[in-house]
Amino acid sequence: MGAATPITAAPPELPDLLALWLPAQRWFAGKGRDFVVEEMSALGILTERPWRSDVWLVRVRYRDSATETYQVPLVRRPEPADQVTHVLVGETPDPDYGGRSWWYDALHDKEVTGAWLTGIAEGRKEGMLGFVPGSHPEELPLDATSLVITGEQSNTSLVFDDAAILKVFRRVYVGRNPDIEVHRALSELEGGARHVARLLGHVEAHWSQPDGSPAEADLAMLQEYFRTATDGWELAKISVRDLYAEADLHASEVGGDFAGEAFRLGQATAEVHADLARALPTGTLGAAALTARAGQMQQRLDDAVAVVPELEDYAGGLREAFRALGAHQPGVPVQRVHGDYHLGQVLRTSHRWVVLDFEGEPAKPLSERTGLDSPVRDLAGMLRSFDYAARHLLADHPFEPQLAYRADEWAARNRDAFLDGYVDAGGPDPREDPVLLHAYEADKAVYEAVYEARNRPSWLPIPLASLARLIEGARS
């Protein structure tokens, strides 16, 4: 990404401070890699009072010469601030600002975060920043205070008085963010999209690159917030804990049976896929495209084996599954899909399931995340999530066969219920095309194995055991 023309010059000490601070942030993708902060550019001023706050683009360069660009809104204070000590980036000399400045992550500073809402409501233009209101800016809670949601991996989200949620994209790519693109398209459908949150506004940036060509990127999106909703992962975990507490009962006999919700989630997923197909382009995969798709999966497997040697035991069966996809009959329907679908990406409100985060897998290039794909990718992702929900607690009980048996039963029951709901709402049954389903599930499990090896080694047996079952199922 080309740098913006600087509005505010960064103190010479600030890049080195950020180089120390960035690896500790959950959303920073370069953990464990050597890098330098190569460039900092300010896009525009968020606030000047009570404290100066700017939106910065920070470009890092790794030892292998790869680069990434991050959005880092910073607030500069003339003295330490106890309420934001936990997000202190560092202090620098500053003769123009009382002698020294203390720099903090501005998204955690409640004295300045309201500027995001005000900017969207007013449609402000500030420097290279553009604040774009949704269809009802008068509904925005301009006097609200913000609360940062914990647990996010790749973005930072702020809730404003349980009325709206602002998702700030930390990793910045030139071009339209797929989450905003999808929500805008769905909002234009007649009647809207019942299972997707309303888009209330967004923030974008426009600048000139070093060669003079124009560039744009999306920085944040504002949506309605569902105060009393619970995410699907938490609900599923409660059901699994109930099952483990009464392991002598079948999954269907336990009070916290999840199959009804899984069925309704399948219905909601089919409706969302239908809405996406109405609002955005569709197509089919011909023979060459299927071969290419299988080749991508094969390459991901080869790369993964280098990181997770345990995958070599399954590589032969996985290659068979991917070769079968390459030889699949042409004409596989494709469309825009969610791309990173799992139980943590859905909310259960008092009335319905709501689907969140249409960004796709953050680590993939933007062109791949915005491309057309089979809806089976989403179905496979959710099926894998049911496996995780059933088995993640087994990491603490590895030698209890009764619990393992019940976990298998819970996963199978809810996987089937989810797909039954999908078919009930008009979606095609992926079980009638096992080659497609096995390939997408295997591709997802390979991705999971790499993630667990790097982040949660005790969970690595979950995707490995799933791969063994997938290979056996594909061969049978």
Question: Where on the chain are the PLM-derived regions?
Answer:
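Short amphipathic beta-strand and strand-loop transition segments with alternating hydrophobic
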Residues: 33-49, 57-59, 204, 325-326
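Active-site catalytic-loop/activation-segment of kinase and kinase-like phosphoryl-transfer enzymes
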Residues: 285-323, 409, 413-425, 450
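Conserved catalytic-core element of eukaryotic-like protein kinases
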Residues: 335-337
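Short Lys/Arg-enriched alpha/beta "domain-start" segment
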Residues: 2-39
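Conserved catalytic-loop position in the HRD/HxD motif
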Residues: 340
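ATP/Mg2+ or Mg2+-diphosphate-binding catalytic cores
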Residues: 405-431, 435, 439-476
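Conserved ATP-binding subdomain of kinase catalytic cores across diverse folds
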Residues: 53-302, 351-352, 356-408, 412, ...
